[in-house]
Regions:
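C-terminal amphipathic/interface module of NAD(P)-dependent oxidoreductases
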Residues: 169, 185-225
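Alpha-helical substrate-binding/gating segment
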Residues: 121-163
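Conserved Rossmann-fold NAD(P)-dependent oxidoreductase catalytic core, especially the SDR/UDP-sugar
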Residues: 34-83
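NAD(P)-dependent short-chain dehydrogenase/reductase
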Residues: 82, 94-138
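NAD(P)H-binding glycine-rich loop region in Rossmannoid oxidoreductase-like domains
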Residues: 1-38
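SDR active-site strand-loop-helix element
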Residues: 13-17, 51-57, 104-106
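Mid/C-terminal beta-alpha module of Rossmann-like enzyme folds, strongest
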Residues: 147-196
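Short-chain dehydrogenase/reductase
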Residues: 29-33, 66-92, 136-140, 168
Length: 225
């Protein structure tokens, strides 16, 4: 990382590094914590002006209603979720060492190459005929919007911003819509929602002038690619 930054001498860095190919939460947390520390160390050494970091918006504590940026993270969690929360904390604390920084807490990403795109994990469950989903509330954001928002964030004030569309959705409602899009009729097993599956607001993001291409996942997933 340091040699790349030394060579390119960038003014701004957008940190979107993850390690999710094998759904290994420990590996992804290591990247978020250690990778972010190394990145910020190098950024400060070579006078990078601003860092924009990709975080996630579904690690808030349990509660009623949509979570805001002021909602505490789920520090009382356990297992893989606690590992992921620790990674989010590490990423965001390291990023905030910069004089100028923005953290984007994205909702669940969808689009080509994701779980919800063609041949993705969720897509394949529906096609194969056996679906298991939680009835919790999900806030989505399209991959294209994640890219676009990262550019918009160049002009955001320092801080943390939830980034998701305007239509949080329960798992049961999503499943009914998604199966109709695919014209399939799988066996759908809806699990009870977890208290932390609550979705997120995007008011703070909009107050900075943030705009999405897809204000609802129904537009972004039609058709499913």
């Amino acid at each position: 990382i340091e040699s790349a930054i030394a060579d390119f001498q960038p003014e701004i860095i957008i940190n979107q590094i993850t390690d999710l190919k094998n759904v290994d939460m420990a590996a992804n947390t290591k990247v978020r914590v250690e990778g972010s520390k190394n990145l910020i160390d190098a950024a400060q050494k070579y006078n990078v002006k601003k860092v924009i970091a990709q975080s996630i918006g579904f690690m808030y504590e349990a509660g009623e209603g949509l979570a805001t940026e002021e909602t505490p993270l789920d520090l009382e969690s356990s297992g893989d979720r606690k590992v992921t929360v620790d990674g989010v904390i590490g990423l965001e604390e390291e990023t905030s060492r910069m004089d100028e920084y923005v953290v984007l807490r994205f909702g669940w990403l969808y689009g080509p190459g994701t779980w919800y795109g063609k041949d993705g994990m969720i897509y394949n469950q529906f096609v194969d005929g056996n679906v298991t989903l939680s009835d919790g509330v999900t806030s989505f954001v399209h991959l294209d919007d994640a890219v676009e928002t990262s550019i918009q964030a160049l002009n955001f004030d320092n801080g943390i911003y939830n980034v998701a569309d305007d239509e949080p959705v329960k798992g049961s409602d999503f499943a009914e819509w998604y199966k109709q899009q695919l014209n399939v009729d799988p066996e759908i097993n809806i699990q009870p929602a977890q208290p932390f599956e609550r979705g997120i607001t995007n008011d703070k993001f909009k107050a900075q002038g943030g705009k999405l291409i897809y204000s609802t996942w129904k537009d972004g997933m039609n058709p499913i690619k």
